[in-house]
Amino acid sequence: MSAFEDDSFVILNDDASESVPVSGSFDATDSFSAFDGSLQVEDSVDDVFAAPSSDYGAYSNGDGIFGSNGDHDGPILPPPSEMESDEGFALREWRRQNAIQLEEKEKREKELLKQIIEEADQYKEEFHKKIEVTCENNKAANREKEKLYLENQEKFYAESSKNYWKAIAELVPKEVPTIEKRRGKKEQQDPKKPTVSVIQGPKPGKPTDLTRMRQILVKLKHNPPSHLKLTSQPPSEEAAAPPKNVPETKPTEAVTAA
């Protein structure tokens, strides 16, 4: 038998001089066939899914490093507003320049707004003055036109009884548009000036149709009613008497006999 076939090994005690041989061979009689499971084995390993023990309750991220009080479970770091910002020189300079530019811009905007308001107030004053002057001029022109119109109306009604047809012709507006003659090249080059002036009718841009009125007036002129007929005045005595210093004409029979 070789030395490797021996399954025994030596256990050295604290004292190296003493050694105890131990047999490492397996005895078949020491099998587990006689184990019936009646022996209760205590489970010394903790259940990983069980609730943590109360012994670990004091360890939390509270006020202390290990949370000895266990009451507060807030953040460890202070809020960002209380933390000092670590800014570089370039960022601080940019913030300073930006604040100066914003302040200057706000001043310019206020000055511009003030200038716009002043110009608007001045424009409103000038506009109101211009409107007042225009209204006064229009009132004066309308008074002159009204005065002239009343004079023409009085004159028309005073002379209408003498000649009815003339009065009717004046009342009826002209149906045919009047063509205005232009003179000079400057007036011809002006396209805005109208060449034909049309009397406006009830609809803008269309002349009044007076055909029916003209037919009625022509019919009345040829067959006037009795109240429109002019009464013929009797001839006066001077008109009936023969004129003086006029030689008497001889009868034609006496002239032929002679």
Curated annotation (Swiss-Prot):
Known tissue expression:
Expressed in root epidermal cells and root hairs (at the protein level).
Where it sits in the cell: the answer is: Cell membrane; Cytoplasmic vesicle membrane; Membrane, Coated pit; Cytoplasm, Cytoskeleton, Phragmoplast
Any GO CC annotation of this UniProt entry: clathrin coat of trans-Golgi network vesicle
Coiled-coil ranges per UniProt: 91-156
User: Low complexity composition bias: which ranges?
Assistant: 234-243
* Region (Involved in binding clathrin heavy chain) residue spans: 81-143
What terms describe the molecular function in GO for this protein?
identical protein binding; structural molecule activity
Q: One Pfam match, by short name?
A: Clathrin_lg_ch
Keywords of the record: Cell membrane, Coated pit, Coiled coil, Cytoplasm, Cytoplasmic vesicle, Cytoskeleton, Membrane
User: Per the record's keyword annotation, is Phosphoprotein included, yes or no?
Assistant: no
Origin: domain of life: Eukaryota
UniProt membrane topology term: Peripheral membrane protein
Q: What does this protein do?
A: Clathrin is the major protein of the polyhedral coat of coated pits and vesicles.
How this chain assembles, per its entry, is: Clathrin coats are formed from molecules containing 3 heavy chains and 3 light chains. Interacts with TPLATE and CHC2.
Family statement drawn from the similarity comment of this UniProt entry = Belongs to the clathrin light chain family.
In Swiss-Prot or TrEMBL terms, this protein is called Clathrin light chain 2
Q: Which organism is it from?
A: Arabidopsis thaliana
Q: What is the lineage of its organism?
A: Eukaryota, Viridiplantae, Streptophyta, Embryophyta, Tracheophyta
Q: Which gene encodes it?
A: CLC2
